[in-house]
Regions:
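Active-site loop segments of alpha/beta catalytic cores
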Residues: 1-162
Length: 162
């Protein structure tokens, strides 16, 4: 499940920890296990409260388009998912399909060394986004991943010996 906490990013790291993360952590501790993951979305975080996000213990962290993904990836442990962060309005809504394709490729290229990175929009995609732009995003992801040897541990692919 994705837990959205965008307003927490408007706070300092200390206040985010005090007024949001401690309560989010209680929820995560109560529901997250090996078969159920929580992803914490904080599109208001521009990099100043990543530590407070990490203190929640979520399995994944979703960053908005104002965060620097390389910095976020460096600050997050390699055993958690780090997601983001193409601008849903400035890229998906406004640009051409060719530009969406190029921006998607650019983000994938600069984050390619991080196996825990999952590309996505940085926040909700507006309903007015042209379908051609969404297709361009998926085509860029497909092109980037085509031929790549993605190392996925066998235990994640095969469960219970089957």
């Amino acid at each position: 499940v994705i837990m959205a906490e965008p307003a927490a990013g408007l706070l300092s790291n200390e206040d985010c920890q005090r007024y949001s993360s401690v309560y989010v952590k209680r929820i995560i501790d109560a529901v997250q296990d090996d078969s159920f993951a929580v992803i914490l979305h904080n599109c208001g975080n521009t990099g100043h409260c990543t530590a407070a996000m990490l203190a929640t213990g979520a399995k994944g962290y979703h960053f908005g388009n104002k965060a620097d993904m390389i910095t976020a990836l460096r600050e997050c442990p390699s055993d958690v998912w780090v997601m983001g962060n193409l601008d849903p309005v400035g890229v998906f809504r406004v640009l051409t399909p060719e530009d969406v394709f190029a921006r998607t490729e650019e983000l994938l290229t600069c984050t390619g060394e991080y196996a825990n990175f999952i590309i996505s929009t940085g926040c909700d995609t507006p309903p007015e986004v042209p379908f051609d732009n969404i297709q361009a995003f998926y085509l860029a992801v497909e092109k980037y991943n085509k031929g790549r040897c993605l190392s996925i541990p066998v235990a994640e692919v095969v469960s219970d010996g089957h």
